[in-house]
Amino acid sequence: MEFPFDVDALFPERITVLDQHLRPPARRPGTTTPARVDLQQQIMTIIDELGKASAKAQNLSAPITSASRMQSNRHVVYILKDSSGRPAGKGAIIGFIKVGYKKLFVLDDREAHNEVEPLCILDFYIHESVQRHGHGRELFQYMLQKERVEPHQLAIDRPSQKLLKFLNKHYNLETTVPQVNNFVIFEGFFAHQHRPPAPSLRATRHSRAAAVDPTPTAPARKLPPKRAEGDIKPYSSSDREFLKVAVEPPWPLNRAPRRATPPAHPPPRSSSLGNSPERGPLRPFVPEQELLRSLRLCPPHPTARLLLAADPGGSPAQRRRTR
């Protein structure tokens, strides 16, 4: 396949490996390209044209390989170029093969389901003008060595009859294990364990950043120590202790006279009324005659003397009767 730009300058090696980023490979020393030329756009054009040619050769309604699909999936494409025939000195593309790891549920010889993640052949195309010249085997063998897998460990997505004959001719893959999906696996597929897919570029980038500039993680939050379980007071005890506290009433009630504090050792309670500790002892009984005698002997008050001096004519008995 020919293109209007220099393919030989874009792909220095005979076989070029591209991932989802579609970055141009390193250029040879001394090779110059104008700055205005977008190399990634040229790569996207090549992949789109190869996908269309492959879909046409397999009688597919739409291409299964395109630059946009490559950028949205973790697939790898191997592109084979022809440097011998240099039409207009720009080189040409012979074909490509696209692979990628996929998680599949496949049946074994006992029809048991197995969850595997093998390397899958997703698209394979060699230009019609250069078929049966060994280019397909060269490209396929290079992919096996680069991915470090054996032919019987592969799973092929909807292979064409040409591809099945190719695998039978060059790798003796003939007996298939029936599946319920569109993938084809061959006898010996379960004999070896499949290599897990490479870590994602994002995870690799994060791990490298952590190695260069490790960020200290926040310390784990410590929980407060659990209190030792002691004797729990009953609710009634708490109430009694609360009532023991003397609460002073607000002003002016707090100025009222308080009751006298009872003696520390009160006298023993007796059935006698005179000995009652609550009412106290009564005064002894005084006869009426003695009370009157004490009043007569008591000197008069100064005020009474003044009244007697103001009324000398009246006798004390008369004054006592008129009052």
UniProtKB/Swiss-Prot annotation:
Protein name according to UniProt: Alpha-tubulin N-acetyltransferase 1
Domain N-acetyltransferase as annotated: residue spans: 1-190
Annotated PANTHER family: ALPHA-TUBULIN N-ACETYLTRANSFERASE 1
Modified residues (Omega-N-methylarginine): 323
Class of the enzyme per the UniProt entry, highest EC level: transferase
Region entry Disordered, spans: 196-239, 252-287
A molecular function (GO) term: L-lysine N-acetyltransferase activity, acting on acetyl phosphate as donor
Post-translational modification summary for this protein: Autoacetylation strongly increases tubulin acetylation.
Residues carrying Asymmetric dimethylarginine: 305
Site (Crucial for catalytic activity): 58
InterPro entries xref list: Acyl_CoA_acyltransferase (IPR016181), Atat (IPR038746), GNAT_ATAT (IPR007965)
Listed Low complexity bias regions: 209-220
GO biological process: alpha-tubulin acetylation; microtubule cytoskeleton organization; neuron development; regulation of microtubule cytoskeleton organization
Native organism taxonomy: Eukaryota, Metazoa, Chordata, Craniata, Vertebrata
Assembly notes: Component of the BBSome complex. Interacts with AP2 alpha-adaptins, including AP2A2, but not with AP1 gamma-adaptin (AP1G1/AP1G2); this interaction is required for efficient alpha-tubulin acetylation, hence clathrin-coated pits are sites of microtubule acetylation.
Enzyme Commission numbers on file: 2.3.1.108
Location in or out of the cell: Cytoplasm; Membrane, Clathrin-coated pit; Cell junction, Focal adhesion; Cell projection, Axon
Residue(s) carrying N6-acetyllysine: 56, 146, 233, 244
